[in-house]
């Protein structure tokens, strides 16, 4: 009886602990399915004997969990497992862990299981940086190639003779000191550009005999271009009327062509009659004539203290100017270059003492050169153009463009001059050179062997003395030959 009585008790006790041990799993699964109530239950499930006492805290614990239902279920399952792993070590700290789920910035705790997921995207992030290095590598080299780009040269076969002309710049310009807008202080480009003319007979494919060639009608012209060789900058306009240039801006001849009719409008009588009285209200002084206003409308106004004084002499009486619109203007005021033709204005721009805002040449000096038969440093005879008298008014980086023209008759001999148009048979650009201000100018270049060779043959090239090579004295010590 007793054994039979104990058997049911043991059967009841055995299932009891078994049921108690099996009871925790259902709440775990229910916790995984239902996110709100379970958090307090799992810790008691792990502690078999303490499962009943911690039941009072659960009512307070579910509230934080009710506050944090938004996180995804897998995250709660992970957090639940973490809570299951933490409480066994601290049984008395179950209530403090209740706020811990409230601080579910458990990204700090999640990275422990997720490091594998974080390391997975990291290679993708490390895969992105590799593309930039190859892209950044060639880019600077490409920019350098673009900066070193030299415009292509041009050559043409002359009709009648069948000769092909080309230019070869043997001596490139390097640097120069800006000469400003005065005509007294001239600073030539150093070293002087030396261009060799190459003539090839298309029938034989060889160069012609330069010793028997008549080069009297060969002319080389020069103009100034920007650093890239994409735009000519032959004209410059100063923003001040003083000798020292405060600022300047370069222009091209083509950019001024649309404004040419404004020069012809100067001589219209109606503009003079009404324009002179209105000029006072247009920030022009009473002593300044309207033709200047019309032809240089974009220029800043002339201050009363300006050194531009000729109009004061040409227009002593204001009433006389408006009463006789035709007589005074063609007489006095236009004799200094304010003529009706555009060429007079161009000549006036070259002459010094111009008012502020007037256009003038940026490249000055001998802009055309005749050909010479000279021997180079190797003793070979050839046709050369030496441009030793070139100066630039403004500071910057420029190029020179050389254009060759044969002004003689095609196929003619002697001094037959072409009365028509002479086509450009060849052109080329020099390398870029820099024009420095007076303070930044490092000094003139030393005389090259080619310059000395040409100077010994009678070409007037400034040759630097040997005593000045070491820097003694100033740069004006030359042998002009």
Swiss-Prot record:
Residues 1-157, 241-339 are annotated as: Disordered. It holds the Pfam family Velvet. GO terms for cellular component: cytoplasm; nucleus. Keywords: Cytoplasm, Nucleus, Sporulation, Transcription, Transcription regulation, Virulence. One of its GO terms (biological process) is sporulation resulting in formation of a cellular spore. Residues 36-45, 53-62, 96-112 have a biased composition (Pro residues). Residues 160-464 form the Velvet domain. It is found in: Nucleus; Cytoplasm. Residues 241-255, 293-325 have a biased composition (Low complexity). Disruption phenotype: Impairs production of beauvericin and attenuates virulence during infection of tomato plants. Signal peptide: none annotated. InterPro entries: Velvet, Velvet_dom, Velvet_dom_sf. Component of the heterotrimeric velvet complex composed of laeA, veA and velB; VeA acting as a bridging protein between laeA and velB. Forms a heterodimeric complex with vosA; the formation of the velB-vosA complex is light-dependent. Belongs to the velvet family. VelB subfamily. Component of the velvet transcription factor complex that controls sexual/asexual developmental ratio in response to light, promoting sexual development in the darkness while stimulating asexual sporulation under illumination. The velvet complex acts as a global regulator for secondary metabolite gene expression. Component of the velB-VosA heterodimeric complex that plays a dual role in activating genes associated with spore maturation and repressing certain development-associated genes. This is Velvet complex subunit B. It comes from Fusarium oxysporum f. sp. lycopersici (strain 4287 / CBS 123668 / FGSC 9935 / NRRL 34936). The lineage of its organism: Eukaryota, Fungi, Dikarya, Ascomycota, Pezizomycotina. The gene is velB.
